[in-house]
């Protein structure tokens, strides 16, 4: 009986890991395929989308994140990093998959630096949420493929 229960437990863990890896692979493929715009950014209830309307984001498979401001006279992109991590290995729900973005402090895109939870994703849209700890606010970010 113990062997059966152990086998069921191991099968459940393998299935959860497989589902998480499948989501991670899908989101990585979607993210790295094309140019993204910030179609919505709500910072603790304040709509700040227009502050980012001229930016284009490029997610590279290497984990590098390029941000380009169409109004900037500089040809140098804003450099950052991005990754996907499992914030809770106890289950395999989509909201346990973190979409991490980091830009240098003082960078125009620094407001986007966070470990965002994924609300939903399609081939052309990624919806993210971040609930700040310690009584902080809730931020929403929607990325749309251009």
Q: What residue spans do the PLM features occupy?
A:
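Sec-dependent signal peptide recognition
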Residues: 1-7
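C-terminal motif of bacterial Sec signal peptides marking the signal peptidase cleavage site
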Residues: 13-16
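Lipid interaction determinants
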Residues: 18-146
